[in-house]
Amino acid sequence: MGQQISSQTQTVMNKLPEKVAKHASLVQESGFLTYEEFLGRVAELNDVTAKLASGQEKHLLFEVQPGSDSSAFWKVVVRIICTKINKTSGIVEASRILNLYQFVQLYKDITSQAAGVLAQSETSEEAAESLTSVSSSQASLWMGRLKQPTDEDECCICMDGRVDLILPCAHSFCQKCIDKWSDRHRSCPVCRRQVTGAGDSWVVSDAPTEDDIATYILNMVDEVGQPLRP
């Protein structure tokens, strides 16, 4: 019985449109990513892009925006700064700021593209020329990708409705979809993290600000433990 259900689930997944499947994969990966794994990916991306840009005038530098990862809800507020730097002059030619979803998306794109080229460079002298030709314009190409529209404002369920609510696990939904889901479940539709009530979510107009998050944490603290008496 279990094998039959698993087979049916896989069949459904295989029939999903490519965009939906990719989006679902990125959302799931962002949700389960630990802080240590996140920092490791930032370091890995810097290492990969440095290798690809060897001998070139420009390279990319990824770094976590100071203070943006200090919250318990770092997945929601963390920001990664991507900077394109001229090696010769040291001048910063362009900078972009990414949220976690955008970073994971770019990480997968860059590492998948780089894997083949870097593998060849370890086994063939001819790959050095290939590496040079690929890396010459990659900094500009990848930086350009950051300017393209993303799905960060789309509901994780229908991928159409505007985000109205964000759970502590950083997954976001439109009100219509989450209302239907919460009628029968008390968990996140994506990662299945338990949600005990309305206090476990943000209702947002655009995106949660640091003030929104601070207020949420303060309200949460008010409900924990007992008042401290002198």
Curated annotation (Swiss-Prot):
The SS bond pairs are none
What keywords sit in the KW lines? Metal-binding, Zinc, Zinc-finger
**BP-aspect Gene Ontology terms:** protein autoubiquitination
Which stretches of the protein fold into RING-type zinc fingers, per the record?
154-191
SUPFAM superfamilies according to UniProt: RING/U-box (SSF57850)
The protein's matches in InterPro entries, at most eight in alphabetical order, are given as: RING-HC_RNF141, RNF141-like, Znf_RING, Znf_RING/FYVE/PHD, Znf_RING_CS
Which Pfam family, giving just one, matches this sequence? zf-C3HC4_3
Output the superkingdom of the source species.
Answer: Eukaryota
Q: Name one GO molecular function term.
A: zinc ion binding
Alphabetized PROSITE patterns for the sequence: ZF_RING_1 (PS00518), ZF_RING_2 (PS50089)
Q: What is this protein's record name? A: RING finger protein 141
Origin organism is Gallus gallus
